[in-house]
Design a protein with these regions (language model features):
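Short loop/beta submotifs within extracellular cysteine-rich repeat domains
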Residues: 55, 122-126, 172-174, 396-398, ...
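Structural boundary/hinge residues at secondary-structure and domain interfaces
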Residues: 6-7, 11, 18-149, 187-234, ...
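Short, Lys/Arg-rich N-terminal segment immediately upstream of the first membrane anchor
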Residues: 1-5
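Solvent-exposed coil/turn segments that connect beta secondary-structure elements
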Residues: 52, 119-122, 160, 169-170, ...
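An internal, short helix-loop-strand segment that often contains or flanks glycine-aspartate motifs
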Residues: 65, 69-99, 132-247, 274, ...
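C-terminal regions of mature proteins
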Residues: 505-539, 543-547
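Long compositionally biased, domain-poor regions of proteins
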Residues: 324, 329-433, 439-440, 445-446
């Protein structure tokens, strides 16, 4: 095993021992979030780690029975101070079972950030940090301790809470003073007095992220990114992302809590029953589908001044109002990746272009004997990921006008248009029935024109009746051989096999959503012993690392 992996295992083993010993601390001290009053009330972003949940699900006592952790913890490379700390975590002076929270705060465009944790005994924490970190033991001044780590990074604490604070050189105040002010701020100026945070913290999660949209809007100003964010996040209200390690899945749930009852841009039900008939030319490696409420989407776009101006520019360019443009579309959209292959043989248009380039190359060489130019050395094959973007349409009135008059794509046949992508392959747009597909596969485009549908279907266990659905395969055996061969070629066989070994417990990713809530789930193979997904991921990773 190389040195880096050994260090990683020692650190991992140390964390597991601390986790096991922390169960004792858990019994000794009650749960509290009082230390989080250090976070400013109008922090832009707050991330909370529920340490107790993670310790319970990781099952550190069980992990420590694994040979890899027993070997790492008992190899004798541990300092006396760290060993003492692992034997008795309370010696640190900090309560490692309480929630840890990070925050980003913005005022007048200037950002500061910090990591907040619970302190039980400031004096013992000062002693432990000075021994473990090699710092000069700080003196207590006005009830506070401070250690400067870098010019704008410092560790500040009292007998109740601590913060690893990252200041900003644009603030005309020392880093220490900025950190000390957080420790002295009363609760009414802290995140604990923020009603949005209270609603966020009341939820059950292992790791949670909260974004206050009101503060983001006020501090970030107006730009293109904010326009897009506001379309889905709303300039008022707040958003959160909650991560939970369940038994057979890792759940990542995001919700936009919009103020004033703002509508979702998703419909209440899934796409038209026929929409997924043109999902992909083969069963997809991954896909995502959306059923959009175009009226709600347009209303939210027009609610933002900058986006409204952009829409007006589009209306002027197209010579018609947005309502007339959108009348041609039904709001159903899907994007699928189906393969990685050479697309030249299936594409007569591309084949003709490549043959012309080949002749030009030969003529060039015949004039300059022995001279070769990459400019004219057109490849014999073009291997690309094959994608299909399917947009549901009610008619071809506006789409046809846009393709012919504005984008000026070349018409190949009725309903089929092409354009060069600039990357060798062509891009095709085909319209038939309720489908308008955009793809780099001539075969897929021509199949839609001939039959009105494509062969690829979503996996049987995917619920496509909701307004948001998706699935992405993670198991190599479920992927086309051409795709895995490409990964081996790009990564190298050794790195590819290591990736497969590390990812062995993972099966696929599913996506679903309704209203203002979306759910991404990473699915693991079922466990015979019923253990939690976090334990299994940690145990598997440790065992694989031990084989290097």
């Amino acid at each position: 095993m190389n040195k880096g992996l050994k260090i990683g295992l020692i650190a991992g083993g140390s964390v597991m021992v601390l986790g096991a010993a922390a169960l004792f601390v858990w019994m000794k001290f009650g749960k509290t979030d009082a230390h989080l009053r250090l976070i400013p009330k109008e922090a832009t972003t707050v991330a909370v780690i529920n340490v107790r949940n993670l310790f319970t699900k990781a099952d550190p006592k069980k992990l420590m029975l694994l040979p890899v952790f027993q070997k790492a913890a008992g190899n004798g490379n541990m300092s006396p101070e760290l060993k003492k700390l692992m034997d008795d975590p309370t010696d640190l002076g900090a309560d490692i079972t309480q929630n840890i929270a990070g925050f980003v705060n913005q005022q007048d465009g200037i950002s500061t950030s910090g990591l907040v944790f619970k302190i039980n005994d400031g004096t013992r924490f000062a002693s432990a940090i000075s021994k473990i970190g090699g710092y000069t033991r700080p003196n207590k001044v006005d009830g506070l301790w401070y250690i400067a780590i870098e010019q704008y990074v410092g560790l500040c604490w009292n007998d109740e809470a601590g913060v690893l604070f990252v200041g900003n050189p644009l603030i005309d105040e020392s880093n220490q003073k900025q950190a000390e002010r957080l420790l002295r701020q009363p609760q009414e100026y802290s995140i604990l007095d923020n009603p949005n945070y209270k609603a966020f913290a009341a939820q059950d999660f292992d790791i949670g992220l909260m974004v206050d949209n009101n503060v983001v809007q006020r501090t970030a100003g107006s730009n293109d990114w904010m326009d897009i964010y506001n379309m889905f996040g709303s300039p008022t209200g707040w958003s959160d992302v909650l991560v939970n390690f369940e038994d057979e899945t890792v759940d990542i749930r995001s919700t936009v809590h919009k103020a004033n009852g703002a509508e979702s841009v998703l419909r209440t039900s899934g796409p038209d029953a026929s929409h997924l008939d043109a999902l992909a030319d083969k069963n997809p490696i991954g896909f995502i589908s959306l059923a959009l409420d175009l009226k709600a989407l347009l209303a939210q776009l027009r609610a933002d001044a900058n986006m409204k101006r952009n829409l007006e520019e589009v209306e002027d360019a197209m010579g018609m109002p947005m309502e007339d443009m959108l009348r041609s579309f039904n709001g159903d959209v899907s994007l699928a990746l189906s393969d990685y292959r050479n697309i030249v043989d299936e594409d007569p248009v591309l084949k003709e272009k490549m043959e012309a380039m080949r002749k030009m190359y030969l003529q060039f060489n015949s004039r300059f004997d022995g001279f070769e130019s990459d400019e004219y050395n057109y490849p014999a094959e073009i291997e690309v990921p094959v994608f299909v973007l399917n947009v549901g349409i009610n008619d071809t009135v506006f789409p046809g006008k846009m393709l012919r008059e504005k984008i000026r794509m070349q018409r190949v046949e009725y309903g089929l248009y092409s354009a060069s992508s600039g990357f060798g392959a062509n891009v095709y747009v085909a319209m038939k029935g309720k489908h308008m597909i955009v793809t780099n596969s001539y075969g897929a485009a021509s199949e839609l024109i001939r039959t009105g549908r494509l062969q690829g279907k979503p996996a049987a266990d995917v619920n496509t009746k909701g307004p948001l659905a998706g699935r992405f395969e993670l198991m190599p055996e479920k992927m086309p051989a051409t795709f895995t061969d490409m990964l081996k070629k790009e990564m190298g066989n050794r790195d590819y096999m290591n990736m497969v070994r590390f990812g062995k417990p993972l099966q696929y990713v599913s996506i679903s959503g309704e209203g203002n809530t979306n759910l991404l789930q990473v699915h693991l193979a079922p466990a015979a012993d019923g253990s939690n997904s976090l334990y299994r991921l940690l145990a598997h990773t440790a065992e694989v690392m031990n084989t290097f």
